[in-house]
Amino acid sequence: MVNKRMQTLLTQLRQQGIRDERLLQAIEAVPRERFVDEALEHKAYENTALPIGSGQTISQPYMVARMTELLNLTPTSRVLEIGTGSGYQTAILAHLVQHVCSVERIKGLQWQAKRRLKQLDLHNVSTRHGDGWQGWASRGPFDAIIVTAAPPEIPPALMEQLDDGGILVLPVGEQAQTLKYIRRQGSEFVIDTVEAVRFVPLVKGELA
């Protein structure tokens, strides 16, 4: 049953324009039902965001795929994720690159994500309880940074932690949010707007 629901989801993602077969294989390899509350397992393969507690959500599969595809990852890409959340996006990244660094502001979510990733034998992830606005400078610079919550403006620390040629993908805004694609070229940053989105806010400073 799960396999049929997964195939339906993959078909939807292809119809929505997701073309990267390596990414689609990673999505197929990650059981989304393991990252949601038991009461919501029946919704795990619907193409929709779901609550995970603490006012946070597991992103819509299309948005996970879209943002990941924009990162243009190779197996050796150095990746930073801001907002571990349930660990679902983290797990997909872990199937695509040799190592993932992930920062989460809410301690309970960080521990739950670590447990889930371990249960799935994904040991190539380093998680940190910290302020996502500050990134993880000691592990940088990064080839790719993905942010799974929306700051009102682009955090300068994340731009600074991009390597030359690196890509930052994040939602930005408060009431009206847009997905931004930022590429570093030396000391310059090229910023493009991708599409309108809706994410929970990226809270600054305050750990929970």
UniProtKB/Swiss-Prot annotation:
GO terms for biological process: methylation; protein modification process; protein repair. PROSITE patterns: PCMT. It comes from the Bacteria. It is found in: Cytoplasm. CDD domains: AdoMet_MTases (cd02440). It catalyses: [protein]-L-isoaspartate + S-adenosyl-L-methionine = [protein]-L-isoaspartate alpha-methyl ester + S-adenosyl-L-homocysteine. The active site is at residue 59. Keywords: Cytoplasm, Methyltransferase, S-adenosyl-L-methionine, Transferase. Its EC number is 2.1.1.77. GO terms for cellular component: cytoplasm. InterPro entries: PCMT (IPR000682), SAM-dependent_MTases_sf (IPR029063). The keyword Cytoplasm applies. It is an enzyme of class 2 (transferase). One of its GO terms (molecular function) is protein-L-isoaspartate (D-aspartate) O-methyltransferase activity. Belongs to the methyltransferase superfamily. L-isoaspartyl/D-aspartyl protein methyltransferase family. Catalyzes the methyl esterification of L-isoaspartyl residues in peptides and proteins that result from spontaneous decomposition of normal L-aspartyl and L-asparaginyl residues. It plays a role in the repair and/or degradation of damaged proteins. This is Protein-L-isoaspartate O-methyltransferase. It comes from Serratia proteamaculans (strain 568).
